Design a protein with these regions (language model features):
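Aromatic, loop-rich ligand-recognition surfaces of beta-strand-rich domains
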Residues: 1-39
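Beta-strand secondary-structure signal
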Residues: 11, 98-102, 115, 190-192, ...
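Short strand-loop junctions, especially beta-strand C-caps/beta-turns
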Residues: 15-17, 158-160, 259-261
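Surface-exposed loop/turn motifs at beta-strand-loop junctions within extracellular Ig-like
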Residues: 16-18, 103-107, 221
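Beta-rich interaction/scaffold domains
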Residues: 38-126
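Residues on the solvent-exposed faces and adjacent turns
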Residues: 75, 219, 260
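Acidic, contiguous N-terminal accessory segments
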Residues: 117-249
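An acidic-aromatic substrate-binding cleft motif
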Residues: 243-269
């Protein structure tokens, strides 16, 4: 309206409509807005007006906009890069991350999704071929050289607390005819397990470093270490490309349907 008016109620009256082939007198409303005053389009007060998010100068977090009410990060499809505490973990290579930002003001809640580019340590995935495993690893950087797991390789768990994951892996390798003994982190050929914190692995993520006969598995939990061994099993034991892996699930809840009526699988395999 050109001039403001005083009103308590707003009435929408449909004077014309198209019945369509079914003869239904329906009307669709895409958007209607009423303001107590004319808003200033140059003043950003709603998260939906924000067009992009930027990374803080120190690279440790995203810069969330200053808006009325409370603004917080409530979603991330790569929490191993940007977690819900708005902490950025430097990835191996450039990563595009989708995040959801929420604005709560009085009794109103607004959300908007943004895509943010987080620069990695390396500009590309290095040399060699990215491991072909399922599910695919989130990050990979290949280095010169290859490594193999042989009968001379030892399993070194140290004080990591990941003995259960190591034992499962040891049993799996034994079923392939490869017997590995327990050892320590001084061995020249070893698979070493390390417990780490504050690297963004969460409950199920992990890191794998392969370098000239030494394979290092790091995780925050036994579950993460176990998933690392599942990736290693798929990669095999011979001529592994030297390199680094950072992996974590995109979603905390995942599932699938298995039709046991048509596909018979032993319980132990499941």
């Amino acid at each position: 309206l050109a001039n403001s008016i005083q009103a308590k109620y707003l009435k929408l009256e449909i004077n014309d409509y198209q019945t369509g082939t079914m003869g239904w007198r329906n009307a669709g409303i895409q958007e209607i807005r009423a303001y107590s005053n004319i808003p200033d389009p140059t003043k950003v007060t709603d998260i939906r007006q924000v067009t992009e998010l930027t990374v803080a100068k120190d690279g440790q977090s995203l810069v969330l906009p200053t808006l009325p009410g409370k603004v917080s990060l409530i979603g991330s499809n790569k929490q191993g890069v940007i977690d819900l505490q708005n902490h950025i973990y430097k990835p191996l290579t450039d990563q595009r991350v989708k995040v959801m930002v929420e604005q709560v003001q009085d009794s109103h809640t607004f959300t908007k999704e943004f895509e943010v580019l987080i620069k990695g340590v390396h500009q590309d995935e290095g040399v060699g071929v990215k491991p072909k495993v399922a599910p695919a690893v989130q990050q990979w950087y290949g280095k010169e050289g290859q490594s193999s797991i042989t009968s001379d390789t030892v399993l070194a768990t140290g004080d990591s607390g990941f003995d259960q994951a190591a034992t499962f892996y040891q049993s799996d390798l034994a079923s392939r005819g490869l017997e590995l003994a327990a050892g320590d982190k001084q061995a020249q050929k070893r698979i070493e397990f390390k417990k780490v914190e504050n690297k963004g692995y969460g409950k199920e993520g992990y890191g794998i470093a392969i370098q000239d006969g030494v394979i290092t598995i790091e995780a925050a939990t036994n579950t993460g270490a176990f998933y690392a061994t599942r990736t290693l099993l798929q990669m095999g034991e011979n001529n592994l490309q030297n390199g680094e892996i950072r992996d974590f699930p995109s979603f905390s809840h995942r599932g699938f349907m298995l039709d046991t009526g048509r596909k018979f699988i032993p319980y132990d395999t499941l």
